[in-house]
């Protein structure tokens, strides 16, 4: 077959994909359900049974680190090392791998090794990092499946720091590689460096945590390229806050990272080739091929900035602050035309990366000067300048947090280099220190819970509120810890605080009575009782519908204390909308309700069918927030029936918007006009969207009652156990 494609015809037939349009091209506003089916085993070459934790346990980590350190000074002709050392490049690669993390939805971060895929591999802010990854390939090739790319990126950053005289706090493995690009909302813009994400007085849209499309944090030249250090400080503070860093951590990270290496802007930026995913096939995935001089070494062009921050760019010291405070600064431009700063009336004291006989005047970025001239950052910077030990400690802690923030609890950390210290941002939960309840205890506790006076709806709502905070993105939230009884979760509107307090009081009575009656050290945690109560209610609802159902339950959750809870960091877990509970808050919504439902389902690691069956079941069980009747398409609430789907899909009724109630609809009998039900966009999407309707039709069939109940129980248990990493080990 002639595989030529340059005539636009040959090579297309008989392939049906060709260059034709996809469904999303024809209907771009259609709800995207495919995000629920990412990370499929079908794209994983390691196979379903591959156990990365076991493979990592067999790794000689010290040997890998030794190889990484040897790499740092083994300069390659195809991409020569600045100052004879790849340390600065590797620190930047690790930083940018982890630095996509955003606290609003927990997405981004180093886990999964997404930097090797589009769009991250082609972001302007990741220019030339493809070289760092290619330099690592021989080491990855040597150790194979024993270390993931995701772990290797972070470990390379740590090894680089060590090789330049800095001692990191530690390293945890456990980041499992992903095998396809994530489809994430990185911003509304259709062009690199666009900034349509702002409104009002430079208010950055959520959940975004970078100022422009294709940047990790901020524009190093200043807001939209305007070289204003004070304005840049505002951007820095907002973006670093959105990736869970306070002011001290921010200063430590910027100053610590900029202690090493340099930026690249040797010539005209127009002489840089296409990004990796647009590069010609013969370039084999390497992008940004330079046509200025040799295109490498002294002729390299990356960001367009040409800055070396210190006089010792391959050594950990305090020279960044020495330079920052030691000179006055004047605006200039790099050879590529980018705004940067040079020291006024300063001698040429900064080394050249490739010619030892040359020296240069000290240079800084606009965002570096922010650390001096912003009043808050300036005070911290002066303290770090005067107290190098404080700076080193702050950088070590901030670097560890940066590179491990998306890994979740310490239970997931692997390897001998894990720090012993427990940090509050890890959302610690006490280890199990008592005998767990057995099957007989569980049966007795279920009976007591159901006899407590709490309704099915109340028990289901409480368990769902506790467990559904889980985010598969950064592995935070979930039922373990019973943090639903603590601030801020106990006060969230969606959790119905008055009802929640009453239900928790009943469960705490049962817990105290059970624990006080034990003589052998056996106990039950409130976290376990909350989940058990919800599961007992689901089983009762199934029995009342004529179906014998057993919801899987495994004890072992523990109760966290308020001292173990960073209240402020849990605030972003509060849902603006929760379609599973038909809830929309008064806060600004940056997604349509049905999009928010899919988004939350994706964070819960649910599939399309699981999302569908859970919505249908939760509606008939009465789990709506504020006891709303929207979507409760049944005359027998509290029973686990498929009525939601049957009554949604019938053609005996028709739907119309309710005047004056945006997003609310009513269903009336086609013949009599009698009002039957009311529902929201989240409810109606299961009849409107073709794929979701296909799922709904499965559960609406006359023979689907038992399948519906069993599928609901399985999906319910999946959510209840979403944070039980001890069960998945």
From Swiss-Prot:
Write out the residues that bind heme b: 258
Q: Where is this cross-link: Tryptophyl-tyrosyl-methioninium (Tyr-Met) (with W-95)?
A: 217-243
Region span, Disordered: 1-24
Q: Which Pfam families match?
A: peroxidase
Post-translational modification as stated in the protein's UniProt record: Formation of the three residue Trp-Tyr-Met cross-link is important for the catalase, but not the peroxidase activity of the enzyme.
Give its E.C. classification number: 1.11.1.21
The record ties this protein, via PROSITE patterns, to: PEROXIDASE_1 (PS00435), PEROXIDASE_2 (PS00436), PEROXIDASE_4 (PS50873)
At what residues does the UniProt record annotate the site feature described as Transition state stabilizer?
92
Q: Which reaction does it catalyse?
A: H2O2 + AH2 = A + 2 H2O; 2 H2O2 = O2 + 2 H2O
Where is the catalytic site? 96 (proton acceptor)
**In the record, what terms sit under GO molecular function?**
catalase activity; heme binding; metal ion binding
Kindly give the CDD domains that the UniProt entry links to this protein.
catalase_peroxidase_1 (cd00649), catalase_peroxidase_2 (cd08200)
Entry note: cofactor: Binds 1 heme b (iron(II)-protoporphyrin IX) group per dimer.
- Which is a Gene Ontology cellular component entry for this protein? cytosol
**Its biological purpose:** Bifunctional enzyme with both catalase and broad-spectrum peroxidase activity.
Q: Which PANTHER family match?
A: CATALASE-PEROXIDASE (PTHR30555:SF0), HYDROPEROXIDASE I, BIFUNCTIONAL CATALASE-PEROXIDASE (PTHR30555)
Provide the protein name. Answer: Catalase-peroxidase
